[in-house]
Amino acid sequence: MTLKERFLKYVAINTRSDENSESFPSTAVQWNLLNALVEEMKLLGLEDVTIDKYGYAMGTIPATKGKEGAPVIGFLAHVDTAPDMSGENVRPHIIECYDGKDITLNNALTMRVADFPELSKFVGHTLIHTDGTTLLGADDKAGVAEIMTAAEYLMAHPEIEHGKIRIGFTPDEEIGRGVDFFDVKTFGADFAYTMDGGYEGELEYENFNAASAKIAIQGRNVHPGYAKNKMINAIEVACELNNLIPAVERPQFTEGYEGFYHCVGFNGTVENATISYIIRDHDFEKFEKKKAWMYDTVGMLNNKYGQGVLTLTLKDQYYNMRKMVEPHPQVIDNALAAMREADVEPIVRPIRGGTDGARLSFMGLPCPNIFAGGMNFHGKFEYCSLNSMEKAVKVIINIAKKWAE
């Protein structure tokens, strides 16, 4: 099976995760792809192929003769797609030798170069895009397809020397639960890489420190005709809180290493309201200050409206993996060298998000993130470059070789 065939097969399987579910995986449909990957690994001849009760699918490419003592390297990707948009009945469209012009997704929707100027970098590439009614699922089925294609190649070419390689596929990454039950010891890798990045050349070993904040507001509903000095409108209190957030510290005004507060949900009546945020910053000190600001602001509003009107629940989600990866420079050096040997110019920059690898790094498995070739994740404008995906396969193979040198 070719890389392209694999990818098209995988995106046809709905694997949308659900943040409101309490099961794990959060949706039963994820098992369809996970079980298919287990069978495919077995057909390719991988050893120690397993899937546990949580849906973690793993397999081993055994070390070539004489390289059994090399570090064990892992490659990981997640099978779920974001709950932001439907991943069911995905109908990919393929453009051979993209000409750099606007792309018609359907009769009512066009992906314009003016809106997505990075399209101009893909002239001459084979692009795979949506029909405008679903997301594509390149995040992260591009990574899944690349790992499986590299595994097939290495199994078929024993002359390529490498140590033991472990590959793994996880559910529920998109809702932040991807490695909640992942057994690092069972996986058995010394170092690993997630194939979950975007643009060709991306190598990321810095990510946000992340927290979630949920504020419940207890209002006081009184007939509006007689509400003076009595009513507390929970909706207006929520709006007041939101308006206190510095405008420049919102996602649409930040880039690079700049953190933010992002309102991700609101539900309310005069009597009750809830407003939810995610808090992000690469710098831990700034991250802590952002959390402290939220506590202080809620306290200030409680002083204004009455103690107990606002109740804040704030939880840390994950941390910047940099401090866990930097003590192992070979992890980055080998990835950089592998990219250059694949004729890929490395782009080292911080992830403005998080990956399974961020949490795994704090669980004892240093795990930076490598490009998978997709763009515009989580929505109807998602697309990927088959050329970049092919480069990612070469990078995986080259990394395997590098660790055995």
Q: What is each stretch, according to the model?
A:
Residues 2-28, 128-129, 221, 318, ...:
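N-terminal capping segment at the start of a domain
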Residues 22-70, 74-76, 80, 90:
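A non-catalytic alpha/beta surface segment that caps or lines the substrate-entry region
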Residues 28, 134-145, 228-236, 383-390:
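Short, conserved micro-motifs enriched in small and acidic residues
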Residues 32, 232-251, 285-300, 333, ...:
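His/Asp/Glu-rich mid-to-C-terminal helical/loop segments that flank catalytic regions of hydrolases
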Residues 236-253, 260-262, 309, 319-368:
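Active-site-adjacent substrate-binding region
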